[in-house]
Amino acid sequence: MTSDLHQRRRPPTEEELASIPWLVLLLPKERERAINALRVGDAEKGDFVCRVGRPVTYWFGTVSGLLKMSTDNEDGQTMTFTGVPPGGWFGEGTALKREDYRYNIQALRASVVAGLPLETFHWLIDNSLGFNRFVMNQLNERLAQFIAAREFDRLNNPDLRVARNLAALFNPVLFSGVGDLLRITQQELAYLVGLSRQRVNEALIHLQEEELIRVEYGGLRILDLQGLRTRMIDRRNRDNQSKDIAL
C-alpha cells in the first residue's frame, strides 16, 4: 500500500470478508491466520494502491469500487492494461517472485482495497492446497486474458476493444464479485479502453442493439457473455480476412 492508504488501513468487516473469494477454500486454521492478517484500506479516487518500482508488501484485492492497472511509457503516455472490479485479486506473480511492481494500480473511484501481507501470502502458498489452486487459476486465466488483449488490440478496431474489455471485466474467474451487473460509468470505461467517451458510447449502443449487454443507470448488465466473446472472435476473423484480401 502507498503511505496514505497504509495509514488508513483497518481490520475487515464480516461483510468485507464474505466478499473475498479465496477464504472459503482454506481450512479452518488457514482461514483464521489469513483473517487475522488481512487489512483493508478505503482508497479515494486517484489514490495509488501500488506504484512502479515500489517493493511488494501485500497481495491486493478489490472489495468494492474500481481500480485500473497501468504503466507509463518512455514518452510519458499512460498505457492501461485492465480494470480491477470487485472480487478481483492481482499481483500474485509479483508477490511470488518478491519483485518490485512493474505497473501502477490506481483507484478510478472511491474503493475498498484488501491486502494480505506478503509473508502470510507465502505461508499460504507453502501450506494451503486450496490457496495454491486459487492462485494457479488466477495466473492461468490472467495469462489467457493478456494474450487475448494483445491479439485484439493489434486490430485497432474500437468496437472490438470495448467488447474485449467488457468481456474481461465480466470474467467470473478473475472478478467473482461482479456477477451480471458491472457498476461502471462510460467515462471510467473510456479510461480503461483508451478511447473517447463518445466512441465508447457508440460501441455500447452497437453491443446493446445485438442484445449482448444492456446499459443501465450507473452500470452495464451482461446479457450474453458467451455471445460477446463469440462476437469478438467472429469480428476479428472478418477483419483478418479483409486484410488478407487487401494484400
Located regions from the model:
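Alpha-helix/helix-capping structural signal
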Residues: 64, 119-120, 141, 187, ...
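Polybasic "coupling" helices that flank or enter modular domains
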Residues: 108-109, 126-194
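Phosphate-/nucleic-acid-contacting segments
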Residues: 169-247
